[in-house]
Each structure stands twice: as structure tokens, then as C-alpha cells.
Amino acid sequence: MISSKVAPGEEEEQQEAPAEVAPAEEELRETEGQLEAVPPDEASPSWATGPPLERLPPVGQEAPPPRRCHTDCLEAPLSSCFLRLGALVGANPWLFLLGPVLLTASLGTGLIFLPKEKENLEEQYTPIGSPAKAERRFVQSHFSTNDSYRFSASRTSSETNFASILVVSHRDSLLEPEAFAEVSRLDRAVQALKVVQENGTQILYPEVCAKYSVGCVPPNPLLFSWQQNSSLNLSELTFPIHSVADHLIHLAGFFGGNVLGYATTGNRQRLVESRAMRLLYYLKTEDPEDRERSQAWLTHFLDHFNDMKSDLALEDIEVVYFTSLSRQLEFEATSKTVIPLFHLAYILIILFAVVSCSRLDCIRNKMWVAVFGVFSVAMSVVSGFGLMLHIGVPFVIIVANSPFLILGVGVDDMFIMISAWQKTSLTESVSERLSNSYSKVAVSITITTITNVLAFYTGITSSFRSVQYFCIYTGTTLLFCYFYSITCFGAIMALDGKREVVWSRWLEKPDQKYSSFKKFCCVPFGSFPDEHGDDNHPMNLFFRDYFGPFLTTSKAKFIVVLIYIFYIISSIYGCFQVQEGLDLRNLASDDSYITPYFNVEEDYFSDYGPRVMVIVTETVNYWDKDVRQKLDKCMTQFEQNEYVDKNLTEFWLEAYMQYMNNTGNNPNDKNTFMNNIAGFLNFFPVFTYDINVSSSNEITSSRGFIQTIDVSSSSNKKRMLLKLRGIAENCEVPLMVYNQAFIYFDQYAAIIENTVRNVMIASTAMFIVSLLLIPHPVCSLWVTFAIASVIVGVTGFMAFWNVNLDSISMINLVICIGFSFDFSAHISYAFVSSNEPSVNKKSIEALYLLGYPVLQSAISTIIGVCVLAAAKAYIFRTFFKIMFLVMFFGAAHGLIFIPVFLTFF
């Protein structure tokens, strides 16, 4: 990502060219690209683009003894290999250009395997092997359901087909006959929807609705009662349970925005006002044929709901809607919104590359080389993605972020190689120039590739499949970027080098006819390009002559320290404010119809959470009084929990004890206890699917239900889940808690653990790499400091930018480690390697050598992902936000904090 460029005149480091490349004596050569003789003692200045190389001893002299901190154990062999590779590419440019092109064309055929089927959200965005998935398997294997006869939403183990409508009154309350009349019209219109299939058959709501007894499950129990008896007094309702003709109606979860009055019987309160109502249309799901017909009805519902709402001309109420299909459909539609941004991203990167690589003279100008360099990066994306699809790695929507990142990161190697080329002498052959350029950039582009690829591949250890697949795709594509940079792009540079030779010879011709044109177009400053490669970029001079001296003044250091203190305090505070977990509404685009639905649900229906099963997982002696007392004790602990409403507990055993007492039977006798269960279920059929009796007349498992409250935030969901599981685990009776929502709630408990583990693994990998390639203790310390500081900063400022800690942001935190390493390792190494006498001058020299490459790397990456800021989906905007924070804080550490802090030690 960053070039560690050494300016001319700072250290007269020279490296003897190999015998096969550089001649041993001065002679005029006719080699292609050779302009004039180059005496061996007038070699061009060395431009190191990695950590400075050890000076090689003159031929025939004994090498000096090694220094204590010998740093070229890997660097020297790597540079030697690249030197030979550069000579080979320079001698055969067309081979190394066409080879990657053909490889890209071959691997690109894998794009035909881009998935056409639906992406499983649960599989991709919930933790692998989460406890809730094991709990679900237990429920499915021990408890049956029947959505064609006795459906109960709280007893289902997985999400069923449904359509949900939230009705919000324009008045203070909808508990008025006029409002109920409008809602009733809406309800009848929904139930009247019918699907006409291609074969002419119709799918009617009564055919696909989930049933209890012989009728469809009412979408709202109070509305159903009012429809049966319009004289029902809506001003005398009790909450959360209301009695209608000796029948209990649960209003909790069906009415929101409530104003409660005085207490009535028991623990009920008078329902004075209610602003919102929920209508839930449950459909059959268990039978595959029924499921298909239900989904066809839901699709028809989605296609025609807005037209139906317009036809009804509802005046007193506003409605929003959502179905069990909505999240999946909207998630798939989200990916289409980002496709146009690819074109904009490539245009911006090409413009940036052209501006960065343009020169005023036509010989050194690398405008078209930069353009082809961007296409080389695009080839790596096609190759990497094609290879992954060929071997069957699933492509998930989050991977669509990857090309934007690769585009920004991939061009960094291009800038480094062009910079090294510009430092070579025009008097050398193309092969020699490319060979020298390769040897200079070997360590720089290799170390940045290794660190970034390692950072991504550590993400494979994540518990989220979406993170695994993103990291596999991106890490592999970065390897292709590296491979194409040293082959395809090197060949492009070699071909452009031949162009330089042709133009140079043309400029040298004493042709008076074109002299004015030459001066105006090709040599605007009236002098020929420097043949020895002295190419001081204005930005390098800015860091050396202005920024560096200013930053090392006492006042500037004091201000920098204050800024850092403010930065780290703010970041630590923000770390404690970060929300955990992926809000499922964020999987859809901003203009999706599900967004207002979730907003209304959060505003009016957040008081009551999921209804949780409390499952006795093993055979216990329910007729034993001690066992019942232990079980009652555990149920009391559940009810006393801050996230549980004790008034809405439902447990068959409690009802059975009352039944046994009313019938005068002894509940402490096994035979009496077991023989009366059948009669009990006849009176209370609702408990039929809560007791699992084996053929040997043993209760192998049973369940009750508790109602959760106040779990609207992700932190409360996490605490509720952990506390309920803790109570179940500590109970003397084997218990388990489960609700289908726990499948997604588990991410809240897993995300921090996964993030910490991935960050630790990646940081350890970076530390090992730093010791191997730049083994200086001071460098390792500053690399560790920078990584920790940037991670804390990015995590903290995520909270200020309304970004959750989820599987998407976890990816970026892993990326953060690679960039922090790049920005800090080179700066600190340049500082400790400097021969300047004072720490201030060492810092200035480090900025002179690396300030512009750090800035260029940050800008190119930000440009690559900045178009995602215009995306209409959270998952893409989040990627931009965090990458911007990573680049901004990483560059700030490399350009400001570390150069200042190094002067204090």
C-alpha cells in the first residue's frame, strides 16, 4: 500500500547490478532502450521503496561484519528474486501481459455461477453453531404442531408464513367504533384477496390461513370479537388481558401506544387509549404444498396491497405492512442498488490515478500507464471472484463491498511501481530499469500484501459465514492484485519504457521544424527530462520543507498531544456506547416499505418482546412434590427477572394442579397423575402440544411460556437472553429456554467474542510479520501501539456515527489492523533507520520519504469506497463509514501522531 521511497542525497546507498544486467566496464551498447554509456562508478541514485537495503560491498572486498540488528534475512533474497523477475518481464513484456489476460478470461467464466437462488439470511448472518440452533432442533424433535387445526404462534419453532399490518390512528386513540370500522374494512379486503394461478385455479385466504379448530386464526382477537359483536364496549377494556363472554383475550402485543388507567381485577389495568393495532395473518407453513400456496398468496398481497389501500380511501388510520417474505425480497433488491456505483468508482479511481501519475513532460508522463493499471486491478477482481465461484465458495451480498475496497487498495502497488520506475535512469535499458524498479519495490508491496491478506484470512475463523466468505473473496483477490502487479502491470511499464526511448530519441534530433512544438508540448520548462531519474515530487518536498519542520516545533507537538488525548478519551467513551448486532431492518434499502413498518413497531410495540418457551428437557417425576417445588422455584425466578412480565406466564403444570384439586384427585400419586392428563387436555386443548408423553406413559419433555418485556434495544436483548439461559442452567430441574427470535439474538452475544478473537489473531499475525520483515524492537512496539490505538478509535467513533458492532463492521475492524500496520511500520522503521543526528530531523526525514505515499494510499482507498456513501442501503454505507474512519485515523497516526511521539523517546 505504501512506498518507502528514499530521496536522492540522503544516503548514498548504491547496489551493484548483477553481471548479467550491468556491464563491468564502460562501453557504448546498442541494446534496445540504451541511450548512452553509463560508467559503473556513476550509477543512478538508489530509490528504496521498502526499508533501506544494506549496502553491498564492492566486488573483491570482504563484507563488513553484520550489524546487531540484521534486517535483510528475508529482504535481500526477496529483492534478488524480484530483480531477476523484473529483468525477465522487461525482456518478454508481451508474454507477461497476455498471460494474465488469458488467465483472467479463463477464470472469469466462473462468473456464470453467480447465485441465482435466494440467499439464506439466517445461514449468513447468525453465528455458526449458536445455542439457539441446537435449542430449535430439540424443540422440533420433541414437540409437534398442527397449523391446519390447532395453530399457536408462540408454539412454533421457526418462522411461519405471515402478513403483518400495523394500524396507527390519526387521532389520540383508535378505541372508537369509527376507527374499528375502518380497520374492519381493511381486514375484510385483505381476507378477500385471491390469487389466480396460470392453470386458472384460485388461492383464497381461507384455504391457506393457519387454523384453530375450524376457522382461521383471527388477525386480532379484539377486532374479531368486535366484528362478532359490534356493541362491544371499547371504553371498558382491560390490559394486558381482557375477558369477553368468559373467554380471555390477550391484548399484549396486539395494541401499542397505550394509556393505562386504574387497576381492575387481578393485575389488569383499564385500557384508556391505544394509538396502534397489529393485524397478524398467519398462513400454513408445515406442509410443503401449503407453504408454496401460502407464499404465492403473500406475493400477491405484496403486489396489490398499496392499490388496495388506495381503493379503501382510509381516512382515520395509517397502515404499514410486512410479510415473512419481505426481508428476503428486500435484501435481494438491495444488491441491485449498488451495481451502478461500480462504474462511478472506477471512473473516480481512473481520474485519481491519471492526476497522480501525470507529468508535464511527455516522456515521464504515466497517464495511460495508470489507466491500464486500474484495468489490471479490475482483472484481479474478475480472476479472484471467478476462481472462488469455480470452486464453489458462496457469493453473498456483503461480498459486493469487496470490489470497491480492492479497487482502492490495488492501485497502491501501481503507484509504488510507477514511483520506482520514475527514479531509474533513461540511459539504462528497459530490462535494467524494470529490474531495478522491481528490486526496490519488492519488500514494500510484498509486506503490504502479506499483512492485508493475513488480516483478511484471519476472518475465516469468524463464526459468521458472511464474514468468512467476504474475507475469502477479498484475500484471494488481493493475491491476484499482487500477482498481476508484478506481471501484467510490469509488462505495461516495460512497453511504456520503450515508448520513452522512442520519444527521447525524437527529442534529441536537431529538427528545427518541430523545435517549438517540442518545447511547448514535451519539454515545457525548456530542459530535457533528467536522465538519471531525479524526480522530486512536489508533495515530497512539501513534507520535507514545510509540514515536517512545522510538526516538530514545540507548539505543534503540544497541540498534537492534546488532540491525541481528546481522541483517545472520546474513543474509549464511544466504545462503551456501541450497539451490538445487526438490525435486520438494515438489510433493506432506505426507501423500502419495511423501514416505516419497523419504525412504527419500535415506536408503539416495543414494550413486549418474544414469548419464550421454558422447556423441561428430560423425564422428571412431576408427581413428586419436591420436584414440583423445584420447578416452581425456577419459574418464580423467571417471573422475577426484570425482562419478564410475571402476569403473563402460562404453564400446563400449574393449570393441571388446579384441575387435580378441583376434581379431588391426588397429584402426588404417579398413576393418578398420569391417568388424568388425557381428561385434562380435553378441557384445556391449548396444552395438547406442550406435553410430550411417550409410549411407556412417561412425560419425556414439557414446556411453559413466559412473556418478555422491554427488550427493544440490542443490549437488552443480549442481557435478557443471557439471564434467562443462566436461570435455566442453574435450575435443579433440567430446563431450556427458546424462541425463534433467539436465532438472531445469539449474534448479540457472539459478536464481541468474535471481534476480539479475530482482532487478536490478526494482530499476532501482524506482529510476527513485522519481526520477520522489519525486525526492529522499536518498530514492533510502535506497530502494536498504532494498531491498538486505531482499533479503539474506529470502534469508538462508530457509535458517534450510528454504526453498530455487527458482522459487517467486524470485517472492517480486521481490515483496520492491516492498514494500521502499513501506515505505522514504514514510518517508524524509516525513523529508527535514519542517520540524522536529532530526533526532529529523523522525524522530518521519515515524513519526507513516506508522507506522500501514506497520504496517497489513504486517498486512493477512500476514493474507492466513497461512492458507497451514496448507497441506499445500510450495509454498503456502513462499509464506507468504517473504511473512512480506518483511513483517516490510520493516516493521522502515520503522518501526525507517530512522527511526534517518536521524538519523545
Swiss-Prot record:
Glycans are attached at N146, N199, N229, N233, N647, N661, N692. It is found in: Cell projection, Cilium, Flagellum membrane; Endoplasmic reticulum membrane. InterPro entries: Patched_domain-protein, PTHD_SSD, SSD. Residues 1-67 are annotated as: Disordered. Pfam families: Patched. The keyword ATP-binding does not apply. SUPFAM superfamilies: Multidrug efflux transporter AcrB transmembrane domain. It is a multi-pass membrane protein. The keyword Transmembrane applies. One of its GO terms (cellular component) is endoplasmic reticulum membrane. Keywords: Cell membrane, Cell projection, Cilium, Endoplasmic reticulum, Flagellum, Glycoprotein, Membrane, Transmembrane, Transmembrane helix. Residues 338-495 form the SSD domain. Expressed in germ cells of the testis (at protein level). The chain crosses the membrane at residues 94-114, 337-357, 369-389, 391-411, 441-461, 475-495, 558-578, 759-779, 781-801, 813-833, 849-869, 882-902. It comes from the Eukaryota. Belongs to the patched family. May play a role in sperm development or sperm function. However, does not appear to have an essential role in spermatogenesis or male fertility. This is Patched domain-containing protein 3. The gene is Ptchd3.
